[in-house]
């Protein structure tokens, strides 16, 4: 049933902010946001019970044209004033429902996230799953690309880019920029985006997110990170969509363009989205214990589930062909499926904490192109499978995995090396996702089909590097 207090708050926000339109936002399979704007005169309490009809056949991977009608079901508790709309607009996040049954749609990512949380509670293992993602992004000055029968090119430029040390600017080249792999926690004047990130943080706070820190990241050409406080799974996925919305729009206001691709530039670090996770029951962190690095047995089993299902998980946590250009040795990307305390070369890390109650597990392979609803839900389901089936991850690996000799490396499993491998793995290893009806098999098949088209398109396209290697 709709939350009466939350609905009352919607009308309070409308009155206090002179709102003219209500924007109903929803997320598709690929993680892209869509929206339908409603004049405020048509917004009433019934809307939160009856929903708003829309054409599901126009969203890739959803309905066919002969069965197109679907419902946007507004979640009143997510209502927030959009700070970027010139006409006062209230945004409300929606789940997607079937109008014939008034049940959540099995291909709606937000509904999948909710079902994952409900399934977790039904197992009795935990009543809350906390997620703290760390999406990194680039801020570029200029991005161009061209794909046609006889051309394939892209061009990126930014005032901070290391390749601009010899560029002539009308106002002169001040030479303050991070060189390759030289940007981590840089300060002004090398960090040119400090005030832009600060503005992003202030707006994110206005929209309900809790900011923990922001800083320049490792790569040249304007790589950044804003750290926000954890939240429960679905709410944190909502917040991740808000995060991207704010980053992109503030960047635009400053003449920049924000890029969440994992590997937009060659030869420097890519952008990840490390995911911190913990489970709570009756208000207690059940990952806290007396095993390795202060973990509980439950936490170790959770890690075991993620490692076991990692290649299938990659389809959701690293859902682009570009993702696997980041997941290569040499750029601080976690390729090997091992766990360790504070060891950033492992794909599963147990961060150091000053308070044992804050103990958590960090999956380091996800990237910011992941649909947060699907990625978080899939990670939770893999972890729960580990707990239910007592999948122990084996011994921790505390050594630098990047420096291991070949004879040791061969015994350590790795993440998928391509989107195609990840999809093949998901095709074979999916039953952990369908427990409790969280991910429908029909949805998994649709997701694989959509992503295979992306793989096929890239496989069929000649690449400029091929001309460099093979033309003459």
From Swiss-Prot:
Residue ranges of domain GS catalytic in the record: 109-472
Cofactor: Mg(2+)
PTM annotation (O-AMP-tyrosine): residues: 402
Binding site for Mg(2+) 2: 136, 217, 225
PROSITE patterns according to UniProt: GLNA_1, GLNA_ADENYLATION, GLNA_ATP, GS_BETA_GRASP, GS_CATALYTIC
Residues that hold ATP according to the record: 212, 276-278, 344, 349, 357
Regulation: The activity of this enzyme could be controlled by adenylation under conditions of abundant glutamine.
Subcellular location: Cytoplasm
Chain residues that bind L-glutamate: 269-270, 326, 332, 344, 364
Recorded catalytic activity of this chain's protein: L-glutamate + NH4(+) + ATP = L-glutamine + ADP + phosphate + H(+)
Predominant location category: cytoplasm
GO biological process, one term: glutamine biosynthetic process
Assembly mode: Oligomer of 12 subunits arranged in the form of two hexameric ring.
Name the record gives this protein: Glutamine synthetase
Lineage: Bacteria, Pseudomonadati, Pseudomonadota, Gammaproteobacteria, Pasteurellales
């Amino acid at each position: 049933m709709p939350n009466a207090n939350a609905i009352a708050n919607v009308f309070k926000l409308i009155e206090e902010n002179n709102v003219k339109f209500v924007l109903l936002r929803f997320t598709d399979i690929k993680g892209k946001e869509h929206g339908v704007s409603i004049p405020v005169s048509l917004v009433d309490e019934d809307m939160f019970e009856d929903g708003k009809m829309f054409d599901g056949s126009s969203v890739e991977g959803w309905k066919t044209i002969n069965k197109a009608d679907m419902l946007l079901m507004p979640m009143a508790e997510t209502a927030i004033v959009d700070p970027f709309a010139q006409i006062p607009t209230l945004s409300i996040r929606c789940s997607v429902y079937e109008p014939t049954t008034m049940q959540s749609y099995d291909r709606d990512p937000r509904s999948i996230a909710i079902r994952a949380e409900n399934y977790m509670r039904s197992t009795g293992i935990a009543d809350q799953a906390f997620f703290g993602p760390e999406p990194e992004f680039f801020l570029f000055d200029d991005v161009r690309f061209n794909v046609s029968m006889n051309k394939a090119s892209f061009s990126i430029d930014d005032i901070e880019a290391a390749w601009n040390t010899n560029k002539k600017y009308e106002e002169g080249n001040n030479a303050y920029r991070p060189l390759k792999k030289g940007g981590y926690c840089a300060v002004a004047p090398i960090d040119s985006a400090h005030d832009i990130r600060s503005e992003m943080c202030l707006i994110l706070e206005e929209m309900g997110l809790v900011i923990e820190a922001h800083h320049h990241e490792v790569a040249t050409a304007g790589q950044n990170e804003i750290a926000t406080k954890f939240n429960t799974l679905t709410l944190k996925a909502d917040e991740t969509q808000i995060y991207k919305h704010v980053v992109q729009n503030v960047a635009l206001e400053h003449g920049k363009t924000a890029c969440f691709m994992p590997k937009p530039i060659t030869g420097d670090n890519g952008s990840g989205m490390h995911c911190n996770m913990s489970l709570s029951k009756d208000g207690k962190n059940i990952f806290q214990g007396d095993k390795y690095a202060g973990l509980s047995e439950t936490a170790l089993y959770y890690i075991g589930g993620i490692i076991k299902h990692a290649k299938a998980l990659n389809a959701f946590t690293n859902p682009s062909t570009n993702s696997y250009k980041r997941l290569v040795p040499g750029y601080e990307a976690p390729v090997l499926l091992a766990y360790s305390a504070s060891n950033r070369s492992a794909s599963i890390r147990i961060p150091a904490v000053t308070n044992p109650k804050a103990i958590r597990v960090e999956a380091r392979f996800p990237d910011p192109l992941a649909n947060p609803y699907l990625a978080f839900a899939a990670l939770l389901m893999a972890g729960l499978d580990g707990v239910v089936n007592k999948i122990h991850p084996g011994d921790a690996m505390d050594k630098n995995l990047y420096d291991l000799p070949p004879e040791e490396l061969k015994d350590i499993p790795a993440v998928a090396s391509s989107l195609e491998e990840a999809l093949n793995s998901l095709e074979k290893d999916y039953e952990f996702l369908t427990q409790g009806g969280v991910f429908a098999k029909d949805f998994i098949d649709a997701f694989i089909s959509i992503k295979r088209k992306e793989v096929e398109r890239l496989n069929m396209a000649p690449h400029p590097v091929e001309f460099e290697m093979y033309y003459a």
